[in-house]
Structures are given as C-alpha cells and as structure tokens.
Amino acid sequence: MLRGTTKLQKACWAAFLLYLIALLYYTIFAESLGRRGAGDGAEARYNLVLFNEILRFWVYRDKLGMRAFVLNVVGNIVAFIPSGFLLPAISRRCRRLPGIVLVGLSISFLIECTQLVFRVGSFDVDDLLLNTIGVILGFFINRFLRRWRWKRQMAKEQRKIKIREIDT
C-alpha cells in the first residue's frame, strides 16, 4: 500500500487516518454533541431540503444560542478542511478539484448515512454542502501552501545562481 511513497506521503497517510478516527468519533459517538444511539429510542432524523437546517439554526439562534449556529455551520466546514488539505498528498485523484470534491462528498455522504442508519445525529443535506465547502477550502489551502513553498525554493535557487555567477 505504501510502497514507493515518500516520507511526506506516509506522514500524510498517518495524519489522515488519525483525522478520520477523530472525525468518526465526533460525528458518530460524541455524546457532548447530542449523539444518541438507536438503543435510546431515537427516531431516524433527516433533512433533504437544502438550507433548511442552516436557516432553522439562524432563525432560532436566540433560543438555541449562537454557539449552536456556529457549531453547526462553521463546525461542519472546519471539520472537513483537513481532508481537503491531506488527500492531495496521498491520492493522485485528489490533486484536481473535481476529484477532491467527489472524494470529500463521498466521505461526508458515508458519515451522514451512518448517522441515519444508527440514529445518531441526523442525515442532513446541509451538512453535505458545508462539509464539501470545507474540503474545497482545505484543497485551496494545500494548493496555496504548495505554490508558496515552490516560489520560496525558486527564489533560493535564483540566489544560489547569482552567488555562483559572482564567484566566477
């Protein structure tokens, strides 16, 4: 599986696996986030109307608290930034925007389906949208940092060339 990979790719694989474990914990098992198992008599909850839950959290932010709104909206985005950041380093498919969107959306969809089947949290199309936005942000952060590093390396090479020209 990891034959022929660089140390950076191996480190990214390890980081991605740790990230997935943490993501699964918070999206499936974290009781502090209101996760209840099917044994608690919970009904399967779902939202298939885009922006419905986001709007509901905004409208009732005075009753639910601004923390609930931020946790739902910003939390769903931030939770998927690492996947958009790490996946391009470990998968060639994820080095272009369509590939990373497809993989990120698939991961999010699997988590939402797991929540529906085991009746923890809820299946929410708003979460799919917000998670995908997070993946895209992570992808562009990765791309920005790679270009920045490349430009730094090129500038360093240019300085070396100028020093060699001066020495000769």
PLM regions and their residue ranges:
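Bulky hydrophobic segments
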Residues: 1-120, 125, 139-168
